[in-house]
A protein has these predicted regions:
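Extended amphipathic alpha-helical interaction segments
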Residues: 117-185
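Alpha-helical interaction segments
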Residues: 16, 76-77, 158, 165
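RNase H-like nuclease fold core
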Residues: 2-11, 17-106, 110, 114, ...
């Protein structure tokens, strides 16, 4: 019984089958040849499996197509996040028609840039700002982070490339003694 409506097991089964067929079609659809920007991330969600709740890695790929429209290219589920799974995902995207990706924004998973490069060798990879900021918070004492984050923000909120480069140089110069921080940025 759902919302005071009784449904037979057969009806629920048929509805589930219909939805699953649409999901499979969507997940295997042909994609555009080029996505100038692609954002990737993996998050963990609780899912029901064998009558118990467990955490699974949910891989999400969001592309910005040549018309500037955002498009979810796919969603995959696995037990954990790994560079090898990301490699499989990029190979699947290639088989679905994606020939070129200019930039990928990603987290700092070890081996991820190499996994992307193995499928799309010309693609530029960059850690996303959110993950860089989280890493700054995780490696520095709280009393230092406010000023550092404020200085770092000047880089990625610059109005143009020239100003961003200048702010980056200022940041590196100011914090060059903090090797741990510089390595993360």
């Amino acid at each position: 019984e759902i919302y005071s409506i009784e449904l037979s097991e057969e009806t629920i089964s048929n509805m589930t089958k219909s939805v699953n067929e649409e999901i499979v079609k969507w997940q295997n659809r042909k994609l555009q040849k080029c996505y100038p920007f692609v954002y990737i991330d993996c998050l963990y969600c609780s899912v029901k499996e064998d009558l118990r709740s467990i955490k699974k890695a949910i891989y999400v790929v969001l592309g910005v197509n040549t018309e500037g429209k955002k498009e979810v290219l796919g969603i995959w589920i696995d037990s954990t996040e790994s560079a090898s799974k990301w490699c499989e995902i990029f190979e699947e995207l290639k088989s679905r028609g994606v020939e070129d990706i200019f930039f990928v924004s990603m987290d700092g998973l070890t081996g991820l840039p190499e996994a992307i490069e193995s499928v799309y060798p010309q693609t530029i990879t960059q850690r996303c700002i959110v993950h860089i900021v989280r890493n700054i918070y995780s490696i520095l004492p709280k009393k230092e982070t406010k000023e550092i984050i404020s200085d770092f923000k000047k880089i990625y909120t610059s109005s143009n490339l020239e100003n961003a480069k200048l702010e980056y140089e200022n940041f590196i110069e100011k914090y060059r003694e903090n090797k741990k921080l510089i390595k993360k940025v």
